[in-house]
Amino acid sequence: MKIKEITLVGIIVAIYVCLCLVMGNFSYGPLQIRIAEVLMILCIFDSRFILPLTLGCFLANLLGLLMGLNYLTLDVIFGSVATFVSGILMYRFRNIKFRNREILSMIIPGIINGIIIGIELALYTSNGVNISLFMTYFVYIFVGEILSTLFLGLLLYKPLQDISLYINEKF
């Protein structure tokens, strides 16, 4: 791995972590709007962003846990897995477009995080499987993700695309 690529990974990780920590409690828990998730849009443009964003999620969840913002130890692992799977699927489905935008790819993090984190929260807060609790958490997580990846993602689509093109040129 070249020094430029390592630098790029470090920058993406740092931006993701900083956005999570600056937003504090809004980035953690069942009712969250994790603004850093807008960076997931970068996965549409280049698969090289998947691992840095996964690492950023891992570190943000770990630091959140250590700071008392994130109360689930398992979220450090499952949240990171959800980010990794979302990034892969976003990249794989990037060619499916609606009105010249990758809307399906932008919705994927909401679905994946809603399922994985919804199950995690439902199991943590109840004894056994509770479908209605899972559905509640799924909706909470899904809506927060959609606000970040779809609505904010559409607003920042062009700048993020330009950043990705610049990075592809330079790195």
Say what each PLM segment does.
Residues M1-L51, L55:
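Hydrophobic transmembrane alpha-helices
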Residues N25-P30, V38, L59-F171:
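Membrane-embedded alpha-helical hairpins and interfacial helices in multi-pass inner-membrane proteins
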